[in-house]
Amino acid sequence: MNEKTAKQIENLKKQTIGVEIEMNHITRERAAKLAADHFGTGRYEYTASRNGYSTWSAWDAQNREWKFQKDVSIAGCDAEKCELVTPILKYEDIETLQELVRKLRKAGAISHAGIGAGVHIHIGANEHTPQTLRNLANLMASHERLIADALKIDQGRMNRYCRTVNPQFIEQLNRKKPANMAQFADIWYTANGANYGRNQHYNDSRYHMLNYHATFTKGTIEFRLFQFDKPTAEKKNGLHAGQLKSYIQLCLVLSEMAKGLRTASPKPQQTENPKFAMRTWLIRLGLVGEEFATARTFLTRNLDGDAAFRFGR
């Protein structure tokens, strides 16, 4: 590993993280109690009067609030429509989150696109500029199809809740080259036909794989494209701690890469060997070494082609 990559990995771990996991087959109260027991605090409460969304909350040893909220987009009975919303996390908290996910799975919780459940990951945007956000948008535009195939993103979700980058947004962004965040926001909302209610939570511009509405309202970059595998007779699936960590690592490295680039192109990458294209891209992003081996596996396993040779053996 060269010095530049090592520094990049060091920096990506300094970013803040927020995760939302939609699931069912578990009540919000039970999930909150399970979390409170997992944290060793035993503290969980019904907090809907403050948080809305029929929320139950659990607190960890650092007094951080983990919310379990009702999300009507999830299939199933209302009592078991459950969305985990984490507090602001750091890289070292990922293991704690993974352990909680494992316990939720053992308790019967299920999450996959077949029940309308996805995974949203937020990365703190405080160190980003209009140029680095433009870089990130171009990185996503040039690799979204590859990522969608790698994750086998449900087409229904792509049509509604996690659309690809709007071509009009990319065209205007790269033509106008916004110098400040106000100009960037104007391009984002007008190009996406959502110039109304910019401060409203459910502004329609949010329903993209890369959601900058969160940037302007919450100070985070939201990646809305993730999902867990649907359970089969052979594998329980539905929630997977290793898969979740892989998704978080991808978001962190994309955000950090965007900060280090002078410019980025929205032009789509080669597609004759998707597995090779993804593997080499992940390496360029900095997902190298044993620490990111699981991420490389999850992000290439569904793609066709030869990971080692672009034109085959």
Question: Which stretches of residues belong to each language-model region?
Answer:
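Short, conserved phosphate-binding/catalytic loop or strand-edge motifs used
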Residues: 115-119, 123
